[in-house]
């Protein structure tokens, strides 16, 4: 800040130094003027000027120091009161811009809330004809057509479910209900929902649940597992998907292993990025690049750590590591 102040006042300093140099020059060329007396006077003036500069630095920079340390949280009360007309102009400008930003942010927030509410209402409305469609498909007797329609229905259902959770995920902390959850019924339900797709692709499941329960939120854990299972089914053909749970130290781990196409090593660091699909199968129009991104985002407030190991062309293993009980103390009282 001192450097900035000196740069700002460099014209004043230059004018003062020029004036002192001029006085010394006149005393030097004019024998009638005592050079020693003038030199002493210049010394006193410089000393006084330095003290004056220091005083002005303390006074004039207090306001701007508060601006520099301002956290940009739109709270203008954190800024020091202006003491000069120019500081008052700056303060009024900042206050005006801040108020404008607050109003703009409020309008955008309201618009986003309305958009979210409308979209969620639309999704819930669409679920009614989807349910009716599912009942109609179940009554069909032609197996080939029934299988194809069931698959397309499932795709629509999963996309709507993903969209619904995407809109809710911003407020996930308000929606958590952490409790001990039995893994078997939760996993079996998710597999049952994918049954028609799995039959169509010839995919089975090998389930070994040594650890029977985990501490989490049932709805959001089901969503995370759903994303991992749909990925495993999507990229596998005529194979088994292994689902295992076990204890590792004090923590419970759940693994979902498929024998699908695997992930290219250069893609592994990016698979949880929003919108990322693949660099090897970039033409894949069915992939949205949102499933794993949302799974990772939902896992964070649940303190679930997701690891991935993959061998390109051989398969992928996703591992969910669940927190121990006391790790949830800062999230919710269990």
From Swiss-Prot:
Record's protein name: Sensor protein BceS
Localisation: Cell membrane
GO cellular component, one term: plasma membrane
Membrane topology listed for this record: Multi-pass membrane protein
CDD domains per record: HATPase_BceS-YxdK-YvcQ-like
Function: Member of the two-component regulatory system BceS/BceR involved in the regulation of bacitracin resistance. Activates BceR in response to extracellular bacitracin.
Swiss-Prot/TrEMBL catalytic activity: ATP + protein L-histidine = ADP + protein N-phospho-L-histidine
Domain Histidine kinase: 121-326
EC number: 2.7.13.3
The keyword Thylakoid is assigned to this record: no
GO biological process, one term: phosphorelay signal transduction system
Matching SMART domains: HATPase_c
Extracellular side: 34
Phosphohistidine modifications at: 124
GO MF annotations in UniProt: ATP binding; protein histidine kinase activity
Alphabetical list of InterPro entries matching this protein: 2-comp_sensor_kinase (IPR050351), HATPase_C_sf (IPR036890), His_kinase_dom (IPR005467), Sig_transdc_His_kin-like_C (IPR004358)
Keywords: ATP-binding, Cell membrane, Kinase, Membrane, Nucleotide-binding, Phosphoprotein, Transferase, Transmembrane, Transmembrane helix, Two-component regulatory system
Enzyme class: transferase
DNA damage as UniProt keyword: no
Topology, Cytoplasmic side: 1-12, 56-334
Organism: Bacillus subtilis (strain 168)
TM region positions: 13-33, 35-55
